[in-house]
């Protein structure tokens, strides 16, 4: 079992090119399954059955593992069995039909509008790194891109004159998104320093060496901007969440937000309606004369 796990991890790293962070999580989850199998005398993946996997999930849940973590474990198991089936090493998948226990859906963290503007309106030095980072921040917030969508952008995916960007989302689905004026200005300023004809790579965002910027490097640059401008932890997906929340708050058009985010299912987008309600509730509590509570009262 361990040998086949190593082969699967090599497949993920070399052929699927998953990040080391994702690979570490998958390996950790699948090693839990191997430990359970060893404990119960199961020597090969083919011998693991749905009842036993269900028992493992129940045990982990009983010991405090979150529904989110258990869902990730099941995803890792399904991925492994897809690989084993494709390689002719197994003929079934014990995770078929299994789902993790339901948990409360956590609302995504967002910046309010003032904080978003504070982040983006700070002074920008006219140098390579500063202009690139500003363009990255503006494009995340302007168009709601995923991290992978941003780092995979090539120069011909952007039409600044038309204010459009074409991205390739999950499942290889392409979509075209608007790019706002501030983001276009930031990109034009970045292009002047990027040297479009010089670097080897056609990526929109590159390093000083002329190579496509990595997702990890973008995470670190966004984190640094959050600490510098806002004094808080910031990650790329928070800018995507903020984009979605602010567009929905202004437009009330859930379907349009779904299309811009590239969500296959509108139920995924509906999480932002809860954020919008939170905002409306906060406005009500601060503005309505009968909503304000006296200090010390809780009823």
UniProtKB/Swiss-Prot annotation:
Please name the catalytic residues of this protein. Answer: 146, 170, 237, 240, 263, 272
Residue ranges of domain Core-binding (CB) in the record: 1-85
Q: Entry's PROSITE patterns? A: CB, TYR_RECOMBINASE
Which UniProt keywords are given for this protein, alphabetically ordered?
Cell cycle, Cell division, Chromosome partition, Cytoplasm, DNA integration, DNA recombination, DNA-binding
A GO BP annotation:
cell division
One GO cellular component this record assigns the protein to is:
cytoplasm
Q: Which SUPFAM superfamilies match?
A: DNA breaking-rejoining enzymes, lambda integrase-like, N-terminal domain
Q: Which InterPro entries match?
A: CB, DNA_brk_join_enz, Integrase-like_cat_sf, Integrase_catalytic, Integrase_recombinase_N, Integrase_SAM-like_N, Recomb_XerC, Tyrosine_recombinase_XerC/XerD
Q: A GO molecular function for this record?
A: DNA binding
**Key word Repeat present in the record?**
no
Please state where this protein is localized. Answer: Cytoplasm
All copies of domain Tyr recombinase, residue ranges: 106-285
Q: Does the keyword Ubl conjugation apply?
A: no
What does the function comment of this entry state? Site-specific tyrosine recombinase, which acts by catalyzing the cutting and rejoining of the recombining DNA molecules. The XerC-XerD complex is essential to convert dimers of the bacterial chromosome into monomers to permit their segregation at cell division. It also contributes to the segregational stability of plasmids.
Quaternary structure and partners: Forms a cyclic heterotetrameric complex composed of two molecules of XerC and two molecules of XerD.
Give the UniProt family note: Belongs to the 'phage' integrase family. XerC subfamily.
This chain's protein is named Tyrosine recombinase XerC
Q: Which species is the source of this protein?
A: Pseudomonas putida (strain ATCC 700007 / DSM 6899 / JCM 31910 / BCRC 17059 / LMG 24140 / F1)
Q: Which gene encodes it?
A: xerC
């Amino acid at each position: 079992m361990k040998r086949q796990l190593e082969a699967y991890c090599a497949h993920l790293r070399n052929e699927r090119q998953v990040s080391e962070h994702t690979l570490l999580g998958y390996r950790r989850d699948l090693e839990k399954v191997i430990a359970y199998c060893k404990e119960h005398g199961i020597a090969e993946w083919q011998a693991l059955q749905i009842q036993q996997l269900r028992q493992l999930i129940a045990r982990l849940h009983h010991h405090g593992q979150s529904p989110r973590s258990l869902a990730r474990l099941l995803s890792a198991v399904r991925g492994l069995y897809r690989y084993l089936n494709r390689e002719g090493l197994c003929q079934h998948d014990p995770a078929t039909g299994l789902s993790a226990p339901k948990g409360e859906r956590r609302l995504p963290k967002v910046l309010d509008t003032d904080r978003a503007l504070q982040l983006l309106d700070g002074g920008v030095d006219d140098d390579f790194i500063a202009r690139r980072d500003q363009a990255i921040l503006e494009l995340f917030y302007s168009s709601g891109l995923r991290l992978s969508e941003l780092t995979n952008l090539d120069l011909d995916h952007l039409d600044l004159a038309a204010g459009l960007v074409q991205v390739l989302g999950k499942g290889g689905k392409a979509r075209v998104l608007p790019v706002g004026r501030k983001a276009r200005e930031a990109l034009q300023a970045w292009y002047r320093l990027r040297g479009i004809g010089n670097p080897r790579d056609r990526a929109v965002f590159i390093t000083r060496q002329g190579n496509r910027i990595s997702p990890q490097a973008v995470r670190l640059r966004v984190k640094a901007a959050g600490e510098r401008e806002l004094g808080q932890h910031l990650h790329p997906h928070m800018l995507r969440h903020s984009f979605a929340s602010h567009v929905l708050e202004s437009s009330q058009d859930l379907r349009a937000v779904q299309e811009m985010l590239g969500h296959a299912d509108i139920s995924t987008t509906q999480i932002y309606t809860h954020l919008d309600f939170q905002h409306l509730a906060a406005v009500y509590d601060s503005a309505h004369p009968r909503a304000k509570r006296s200090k010390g009262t809780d009823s």
